[in-house]
Amino acid sequence: MIDVDVWVRGTSQAATRTIQAVNGDAASWTEADVRMLLTEMLLSLEREKNPGGETPEVSLRGFSWIVSQQDGGVLVHIEMQMGTASAGPFAMDEARLTEMIARVVDRAIQLFGG
C-alpha cells in the first residue's frame, strides 16, 4: 500500500488516500508499476475532488511531475490545474525512477497525442 497526499485547488486542506494497486517495494517496480502509480495518483486527486463520481479514463497527459530526494528515498509529485498529489518516500534511486516515469509518460504521449 502507498499513501498519497492530495490537495485540490481551491480547498484549504490536504487529504491522504491509499493506493493498493501498486506494490510498495519500489526496487522491484517495472514500467507497468510506474504507470499504475501515476494513474492511481491522478485518480486519487479526481476522487478527492469528485467523491462518488464515475472513474474517468486516464491517459497520463496534461500534468507536470517531478521526483525529489527525501530522507529515506524519493518522492513523486504530480501537479495539474485540479491540484497536486505526492507519494513516497520510495527506496529507489532518483535517476532510475525519473527515467522510468519519463519513458512511461513519453509512451503515453506517443499513443494518445500530447
Each predicted region: which residue ranges?
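Positively charged, low-complexity terminal tracts
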Residues: M1-G114
